[in-house]
């Protein structure tokens, strides 16, 4: 059967693959579109395996809520260009919908969407990864997203505006703990030892150094905890003081940022272009 423009168009619409890939697949199957789709799916798995080693540190954070439960899901890709792609964002949204529909582990979620992920890798040409999810429960849940890169959900007893402002603060200031007393003892002990050594290196005696460290440790636990941080909208007051004034309470929060903890490979622009040209020639 002749490979017509109409056949190529139909295959593109059904698979989302590029025009040349569709034409090649149809040529190899003498115009058998069903066989072409089957072969493309098989080769897609192979392509996805090759892409698996590529660092995927861009992407999007999707937040979904259902009653007193919310979930934040991170789906990664390799470039910020693909992170804005309609197909990529639609895939990420479906993953998040599945996560809020039923409490699942990240392994279950990855397995559920593996076939769709492979198809998307084939279509887009980048490594795609369903990386992590995090649930949060609370009486009142308020979300805030800074673009698609940072997602925050705050749980508490307060009006929505107050919780929204706190969520914005969490996005900007990245607190690690809820209150100063929540900072783990081992973290406090480690920082305390560092501060004592700093003071002694400044020429202070051990006795004086230990007294100086008391104030420094109070500052440290405040800086790493939500209620101890200076409120971004009113820096002369802490978040804790603002909450007290409003007779409000924050019980928990979750902050997720795209690419956290992923080691990114640094390449200069010339090297990146050269790599793309080499990849194009290899096809």
Swiss-Prot record:
Disulfide bonds: none
Predominant localisation class: cytoplasm
Stored SUPFAM superfamilies: Elongation factor Ts (EF-Ts), dimerisation domain, UBA-like
Entry keyword set: Cytoplasm, Elongation factor, Protein biosynthesis
Stored NCBIfam families: tsf
Gene Ontology cellular-component annotations: cytoplasm
CDD domains from the UniProt entry: UBA_EF-Ts (cd14275)
Free-text function comment from the UniProt entry: Associates with the EF-Tu.GDP complex and induces the exchange of GDP to GTP. It remains bound to the aminoacyl-tRNA.EF-Tu.GTP complex up to the GTP hydrolysis stage on the ribosome.
Keyword Protein biosynthesis in record: yes
Region (Involved in Mg(2+) ion dislocation from EF-Tu): 79-82
Entry protein name: Elongation factor Ts
Keyword Protein biosynthesis applies: yes
A single GO molecular function term of this UniProt record: translation elongation factor activity
Organism ancestry: Bacteria, Pseudomonadati, Pseudomonadota, Gammaproteobacteria, Alteromonadales
Family: Belongs to the EF-Ts family.
Protein's cellular compartments: Cytoplasm
